[in-house]
Amino acid sequence: MIKKIVALFLLVVSTSVFADDINLWKKSTLNKIVQKGELVVALEPGYMPFEMKDKRGRIIGYDVDIAKAMAKAMGVKLKIEETAFDGIIAGLLTNKYDIIISGMTITQQRNLKINFSDPYIVVGQTILLNKQYQNEIKTSKDLDNEKYTITAVLGQTGEIAARKFFKNAKVVTFETESEAVSEVLSGRAAAFVNDQPYNTVFMDGKGKDKLVHMDKPLTYEPLAFAIRKGDPDFLNWLNNFLRQIKEDKVVNLHEKLYQKWFVDTKWLQRVQ
């Protein structure tokens, strides 16, 4: 009798768990993407080489190619939703798009609101310095002085790093990277704090002979895809997608995209 009761109990529990799994899948963003046949990705152009516009106004970059590969793996169309970075999380939480692929750093503060996939690349914050200051500013510590103005992008980790490491300097924020770095090029600010890949690429172009790249990273920053909470199926798929493109040495997509956007800078001719 006891065995029958235990068996019945286990059956009820397993049935309940199975039903919960089915309900989770029905609510999953991944299921909805497959059903509608479209993946909607939010990003903000202007963050080289992750996302930017070419001379014809088309959005290109490392993140765009990752998004294309993701949509192809899902068997759906890709739609890019151009979104200002300071409101990009709010848009995700109000279901304006399915996922954020926009060079977003994993932070504990953001993680309280959204879930992150495993990192797809790791960067750090570095400094672009106006050349007129190169004799007086030899290390990042020298920049922590009230006589210096430092720029960063509003709401990004460059702003967080600037305020953390340069408490005595004046930190001024801007909506875009181009606005913030222009202040340094013009001499109105001494330095710009931003992600290392962007700063490296900028030095190969407009920053050459005008700026100094202090390329020792101030921070360790893993970048990841951002999705809404409560969606284990989507998160599982994303992590497996990342694992596949990183470990598949036949297709070698991860390495090819890294070479295309971070090593080879031919694409600069398309945006300048």
Task: Pin down the residues of each PLM region.
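Beta->alpha turn/N-cap motifs
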Residues: 42-47, 81-86, 95, 99-107, ...
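A conserved helix-loop-strand patch within extracytoplasmic ligand-binding domains
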Residues: 76-87, 104-164
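A ligand-binding cleft/hinge motif common to bilobed small-molecule-binding domains
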Residues: 87, 104-112, 161-164, 182-186, ...
